[in-house]
Every structure is written in C-alpha cells, then in structure tokens.
Amino acid sequence: MPSALESRLIDLESRLTHQEAMVDDLSDVIAAQDRTIARLVVQIRHLAGALRDVELGSIGSPADDKPPPHY
C-alpha cells in the first residue's frame, strides 16, 4: 500500500500531466485564433480600401454631373 506521501506525489504528477495537456490545447487554440485574426485584418483592410474607392468614385465634381434627359 502506497504511503500518504507517495499517493500525494502520484496525484500531483497526474494533475501536472493534465495541466500540461490543457496548456498545449489552449496554445493550439490561441495559435489558430491568431491566424484567424491576421486573416480578418487583411480582409478588413481590403474592404476599407474598396469602400474608400467607392466613396471617392461617387463623389465627383459638379461638372461631371450630366443633366437628366428630358422627355
């Protein structure tokens, strides 16, 4: 029969093993989230540029406005 000290040591080693596995899992999740965030930042920059182009294209000078055709 293991002594109290041996039982405690076995319990601590078991907890450490589980915590190490959890840290590895969380590290993988964080790395995946980092990749997702980087991809989303690129998409936002692209969309912001496209929106800016649309806004600049819709704001023309008054000379560019043609009068509507009359029937």
Swiss-Prot record:
Belongs to the SlyX family. This is Protein SlyX homolog. Transmembrane segments: none annotated. It comes from Rhodospirillum rubrum (strain ATCC 11170 / ATH 1.1.1 / DSM 467 / LMG 4362 / NCIMB 8255 / S1). InterPro entries: SlyX. Disulfide bonds: none annotated. It comes from the Bacteria. Signal peptide: none annotated. Gene3D superfamilies: 1.20.5.300. It holds the Pfam family SlyX.
